[in-house]
Amino acid sequence: MSKYLGIDASTQSMTALIIDVEATPRIAVEESVIFDEHFGGRYGVENGTIDLGGGQVHAPPLMWVEALDLLLAKLCDHGHDLSRLRAVAGSGQQHGTVYLNQTAAPALAGLDPARTLAAQLAGVFSRATSPIWMDTSTTAQCRQIEAAVGGRQVLLQLTGNTAFERFSGPQIRKFSQTDPQGYDRTAHIGLVSSFVASLLAGRLVPVDPGDGSGTNLLDIRRRQWSPEALQATAPELARRLLPITPSTEAIGEISPYFARRYGFSPTCRVFPFSGDNPCSLIGLGLVEPGRVALSLGTSDTLFACMDQARACDSGEGAVFCSPDGINYMALICFLNGSLAREAVKDQYSLDWEQFAQALRDTPPGNGGGLMLPYFAAEIAPHVPEPGVVRQDLDPADANANVRAVIEAQALSSRLHSAWMDVPVTSLSVTGGASANEEILRVYANVHSCPVHRFQTTNSAALGAALRAWHGCEGGESGEPMGGWRETVEPFTRPQTTIQPDPGAARVYAKMLRAYERLERSAIDR
């Protein structure tokens, strides 16, 4: 068997990607289920989420259950032989938490292949919806956790991060405070990643250090839960969590449910699922310190591979363990990613080709016009209330506003990633918007470096599949970095490279200071 499956449970979709490593390694299959298309009416989701107001953004975990069945059925319907899969690994949108009652473990162990997953697992949740990474409603809980461990800097040094509203720990604390009965009914708390892995394994499985880093609960250097952080977060939290499992060690073989229903080999191994950002680190080939990548998705994320856990003192950035089991990743997340791009596109009734043409028709620097595209509350910089700011920019000028939003995103990515202290000599780009060369051209010029685009935009699913392959080929023995390089290299050769224009790069070097002043003045107000 020479095929490996990666599954990515992201915000808006669930994706399967199969690699075939026989002879010439290649991506053999990509298949997705878009949540809004299949489940929008049933679960009331928009862009895969439910906006509950007051900064609360959730998603129904039963929708993810149903999506997994549908995704595997689509693979079979399209003629893909799942019996040839040697192993599966996966990724999940980070920070989201899933709350399960005491019936979950026996229900997973006794799944009937004649029935759907959703029909059998509808009753296993102690909380009907899961707070996800877009939720900003836990500021009070963040401050409480920081105070309980001895202050913001103590938590930063312990976990690699200050308390973030979207992180799992503050969300768990809020649930324990606002619904103590629901918390009492909760026998197990998982992340999106470990929950989907539990479905495939047919039992509750642990979180890995990569995704555990996004909880405010993990000792970043020991790669284990921090007793101090657990105690500061919620009562009896430790018993609701399984011990952290190494990212590179198999957690077992696939559940008989999937072998009988979809034809998986009973010996197909399941490796720990990790977060989507840590898996993208692998999927873009960032397995050596000093390499930098950008994901242009629902949110935009700039991240780098580091050999040490270097924390961001300002609290804007985050540090996670890499699922390579060796390194760390520095990350900064900008919530107004595709959200802002789509808002501008829709405001002027453009399609994506017209959006790209607007960038071609406007000069670098936009004649001095600037935008702060806070269509939603922003993570970096910390902007708690939405509000778009324009300077020397006519709201009626569609082309100028298109350029302004892209230039703002690129300038912000450069400005707020300086803490990583990693020279950006090239930028590997993934995500849906990476298909737009004009957007990438702006990033190449702002960062004054080549931008590389790859065969697939599904870097998290690819990273998961590569983790499954690497795990089967010796990862459990602590494979050295060279082994990772051999694993990722065939899949991370750039398909397209966009070189910076020196003249435009000089324009943006000056523009960066003007953007920084506008941002600071808006935040200070």
Label each region the model flagged:
Residues 81, 232-240:
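A structural motif corresponding to the C-terminal end of an alpha-helix
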Residues 5-6, 15-18, 139, 143-159, ...:
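Active-site core segments that coordinate phosphate-bearing ligands/cofactors
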Residues 33-35, 246, 500:
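Active-site donor-binding loop signature of nucleotide-sugar glycosyltransferases
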Residues 1-119, 259-260, 264-269, 447-451, ...:
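N-terminal glycine/serine-rich phosphate-binding loop of ATP-dependent small-molecule kinases
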Residues 135:
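Carbohydrate-associated surface elements
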Residues 51, 55-56, 77-131, 161-166, ...:
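Short beta-strand-loop/turn "lid" adjacent to the catalytic site in phosphate-handling enzymes
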